[in-house]
Amino acid sequence: MNNNTTAPTYTLRGLQLIGWRDMQHALDYLFADGQLKQGTLVAINAEKMLTIEENAEVRELINAAEFKYADGISVVRSVRKKYPQAQVSRVAGADLWEELMARAGKEGTTVFLVGGKPEVLAQTEAKLRNQWNVNIVGSQDGYFKPEQRQALFERIHASGAQIVTVAMGSPKQEIFMRDCRLVHPDALYMGVGGTYDVFTGHVKRAPKIWQTLGLEWLYRLLSQPSRIKRQLRLLRYLRWHYTGNL
């Protein structure tokens, strides 16, 4: 019988990743023995792997995060190639966030939401409360000035939030989480990018079959042809993968 409260780690190009077998493993690991873990969750995909290589500050930020997990299918395939016995699966950040929110609602875990447009954030709060009875103890949209950051950190700390989710895009959200933890360290932080937009229906996600086949990237490209430059950039990652430079 597998022990879901622990997880192996795997290294790709110097980055240590948690190897979750599936979503249930991820949830049981984060809520091991009824105690929510504290630290920072960062989703890792091929694009982020490239950014880490190119930007020393981002690499330092992400290396410092306790819980780095495979969000992209390319990363999962690379782990399996380097470690043939690895039982690791993709855990999509958007799905993990929803499951965390559902679990938080069930267990009364307090949540603070940061980021997104004001109207999207308001809709996210309403849906979380209606759908899972999530105890949201505070929120702040993404439109705040740099000089307001410290006051926001103090608000988060005063709220006593056990989970803080930040939708600001990378690396802004990683910088925010790092700095906020100096004021409010006793929480689980999660960078969620555009998840609020998807959750509220403002952005359409790839159909399940595309996700299952590992083709969510292609769906996004077909939906947004302007992403072609970003996708071509990923050829470098494919070279790492197929030459075994992992």
Swiss-Prot record:
Enzyme class: transferase
GO aspect biological process, one term: enterobacterial common antigen biosynthetic process
UniProt KW Transferase keyword: yes
UniProt keyword Nucleotidyltransferase, yes or no: no
Source species, domain of life: Bacteria
Classification via InterPro entries: UDP-ManNAcA_Trfase_WecG, WecG_TagA_CpsF
Pfam family, one: Glyco_tran_WecG
Pathway: Bacterial outer membrane biogenesis; enterobacterial common antigen biosynthesis
GO terms of molecular function: lipopolysaccharide N-acetylmannosaminouronosyltransferase activity
UniProt keyword annotations, A-Z: Glycosyltransferase, Transferase
EC number: 2.4.1.180
Catalytic activity: UDP-N-acetyl-alpha-D-mannosaminouronate + N-acetyl-alpha-D-glucosaminyl-di-trans,octa-cis-undecaprenyl diphosphate = beta-D-ManNAcA-(1->4)-alpha-D-GlcNAc-di-trans,octa-cis-undecaprenyl diphosphate + UDP + H(+)
Endpoints of the signal sequence: none
Protein purpose: Catalyzes the synthesis of Und-PP-GlcNAc-ManNAcA (Lipid II), the second lipid-linked intermediate involved in enterobacterial common antigen (ECA) synthesis.
Record-stated family: Belongs to the glycosyltransferase 26 family.
Protein name: UDP-N-acetyl-D-mannosaminuronic acid transferase
Organism, scientific name: Escherichia coli O157:H7
Lineage per the UniProt record: Bacteria, Pseudomonadati, Pseudomonadota, Gammaproteobacteria, Enterobacterales
